[in-house]
């Protein structure tokens, strides 16, 4: 874990000054809890605080600069401050930590090349960690929670076709798709069937505050067959109450279902032990965020099988699982001793696809509509 790396470095160099930079105070507060030791030679600072106090960079004098979640240093304003710091202390040793060195939505920028001249000491993908049995193999449930807009968009595309024969053919497929979606079990039944630990802890990822509020309103219906009175916690990224809610969620050992609704504060850097699963309520996202959210359900040494509910509101998002599948297939080739000769992705990753019938019809429509 990142906290172990920090602790080892600081213990080995007690007389050196460490400057630890991270995207938010929540991240280093959690890392402090994991370290469980007080060190007087570490100075903690968020990237935004460094940016606001650029004028005091010449007073910092670090021997070691730790860049936590260093892919975030590619952001234009934060990046300027970090570069100014690195230029001011060229002899300071640098340590960067991140789930990925690539900024997927920023022209695939490689921040390991930009900040560390490509020096990567250790790299392990989520898929590799699962294949090598460092992390547990999850149960993965795919379902849709909203499809009205998707059907409307498909209808418009069909109406825009010039060939009447194609219009008629695709309208029939659209009707089949609508029927398949209507006949599929609703989320109330999906959760009742797949959420086998009614007193478990689950992190619910939403795309924004408005989206989170909408999704919380659905909780009474969606989880009614699991627990009629779930404990619901809310984590807004920049609010003081977030720390309190987050701490209460971690401490809750009661007999009720526990749901922590959050936006982005748990995408990176912050870990919660004994989480039984994650619920991804998401539009299409970058691979890094998708894998980080899945990673929140998996903890090394866990004795239980976590469950991932991948709930999407558009068909394109149903294919995000492919990026994890590719990582695992590569790991099977790189580490043949960790599995039997005939073993592959489907043997180690249990997928329950509640969208199978509708997805097949959608693929036919996509091919027809180009």
Which role does the model predict for each range below?
Residues 286-302:
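Conserved SF2 helicase motif VI
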Residues 106-202, 216:
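Interdomain helical connector at the RecA1-RecA2 junction of SF1/SF2 helicase-like NTPases
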Residues 261-262, 268-283, 289, 306-310:
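A short beta-strand element within the Helicase C-terminal
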Residues 231-263:
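Conserved helicase ATPase core of P-loop NTP-dependent helicases/translocases
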Residues 297-323:
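Conserved segment of the helicase C-terminal RecA-like domain
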Residues 173-189, 318-370:
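Long, largely alpha-helical accessory region at the distal end of helicase-like NTP-driven motors
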Residues 58-96:
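SF2 helicase catalytic motif II
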Residues 1-6:
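Short, small-residue-biased leader/transition segments that mark boundaries at the very start
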